[in-house]
């Protein structure tokens, strides 16, 4: 059932002329029915965890991987990574270095030398194997970015999307992330000198925050409920009716009953 056929069904039930088109129709009654249909779609979407609107998203923890091009045998070890963007005091995870493999899998606090070079605090690489090639550095950070940067932009509204609790897992570590934390619990963790033992998360300021800060480059997945309750005939999801050929992702029968109720309530 499309928007057009649903509205035609509604108009027959409420006793007004059925339209041949809805979108762009200038008849005041059809304009009102369309407005009521959009109201009904929004409210239905918020009332239930519809499986048709449930989606899964995966993302990679930490900042973008920065390519390492050189590492010195020195105290402290000096790392070359063009335009790394790091600041003194930042922590980075290093992986995939060839040659100087002793660096791999470890977390380092760094000192910025310049835009392309940083040193690894308290790391004497003088006796390490010689660096040959490759390597990635990732900034260790509690914030995994905005929700909108994690969830596909084409099916997202930060004010309406709902994350499904108890579905967030670190697939690399095969461990759950517990949450979302309350404000009190999260602030308590920030005040504590102890980290762990559980990985936890909180949403704040439209950011996804992890505690403790995860290792960079790991895959995390979770489910969420989209606020897009209809879609175009081509399958593009939407949060409002825009064309006669649009199709509901929620039962149009339920929507039609709701529109009829709204019409009668308004009269």
Spell out what each predicted region is.
Residues 1-67, 136-267:
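Glycine-enriched, solvent-exposed interface loops adjoining structured elements
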Residues 63-151, 216, 224:
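Small/polar beta-strand repeat architecture
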């Amino acid at each position: 059932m499309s928007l057009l056929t649903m509205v035609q069904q509604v108009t027959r039930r409420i006793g007004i002329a059925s339209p041949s088109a809805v979108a762009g129709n200038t008849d005041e009654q059809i304009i009102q029915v369309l407005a009521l249909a959009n109201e009904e779609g929004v409210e239905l979407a918020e009332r239930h965890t519809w499986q048709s609107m449930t989606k899964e998203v995966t993302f990679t923890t930490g900042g973008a991987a920065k390519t390492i091009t050189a590492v010195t045998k020195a105290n402290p070890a000096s790392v070359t990574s063009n335009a790394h963007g790091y600041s003194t005091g930042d922590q980075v995870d290093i992986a995939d270095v060839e040659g100087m493999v002793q660096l791999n899998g470890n977390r380092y606090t760094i000192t910025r030398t310049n835009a392309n070079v940083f040193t690894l605090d308290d790391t004497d690489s003088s006796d390490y194997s010689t660096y040959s090639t490759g390597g990635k550095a990732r900034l260790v950070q509690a914030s995994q970015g905005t929700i909108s940067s994690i969830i596909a932009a084409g099916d997202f509204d930060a004010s309406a999307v709902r994350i499904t609790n108890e579905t967030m897992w670190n697939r690399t570590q095969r461990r759950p992330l517990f949450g979302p934390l309350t404000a009190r619990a999260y602030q308590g963790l920030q005040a504590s000198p102890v980290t762990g033992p559980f990985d936890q998360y909180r949403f704040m300021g439209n950011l996804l925050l992890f505690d403790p800060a995860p290792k960079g480059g790991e895959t995390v997945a979770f489910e969420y409920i989209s606020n897009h309750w209809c879609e175009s005939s081509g399958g593009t999801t939407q949060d409002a009716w825009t064309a006669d050929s649009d199709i509901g992702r929620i039962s149009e029968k339920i929507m039609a009953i709701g529109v009829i109720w709204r019409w009668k309530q308004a009269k």
